[in-house]
């Protein structure tokens, strides 16, 4: 790792520790995914903080062609993973930075012996639980999404937490694409879709993550959650707003944002 990557990582870690915004990118922006993951790995080393899972996001064309990947990943720290209870979950976000909410399926990893899964069908054997949920995306750097996938990767994949909702029965895993999903913010619907629009779906996202971790020398752990990708889109949200995701025939989950 070069010193510049370490300095960028340290700036993001410090900003996240202290809930401070960064008005500018703290260094030279990475121009390729390899450089971006070097920064992400340096941040993980700085934290020395338990990981509870990983978020997977989509890289759209033409950037996916230029970068050689159609997805990206980022760490989810264990202390930012919440389970739905009687009251609405509350998540801190960066006021003055970037914040968004995403309806997603959450997959719990159960690593197996042998080669990594190459297809979404094979990836099902590496998962022992699926839940509905919400990913909270937030960064101290407000232009993180505007600056593109490499910048997103360099700041923890733009993740700030996960909410785990109801379980999806194992008999339904083959038909996740048939489950209609909608997302509301403060009572207004902002998106509606299904995983049929998502590359090779949630299990394909898990397979991608496992390959990414292997390439980086990170061994997957049982119990890690995979936030498998935004179904209805990436919807910006502000402190005080409430998000509700509904998964037809499965249930709903909701969370309130608060200033960090």
Regions found by a protein language model. Give the residues of each.
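Catalytic-core "active-site belt" of small-molecule-metabolizing enzymes
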Residues: 2-201, 238, 242, 252-260
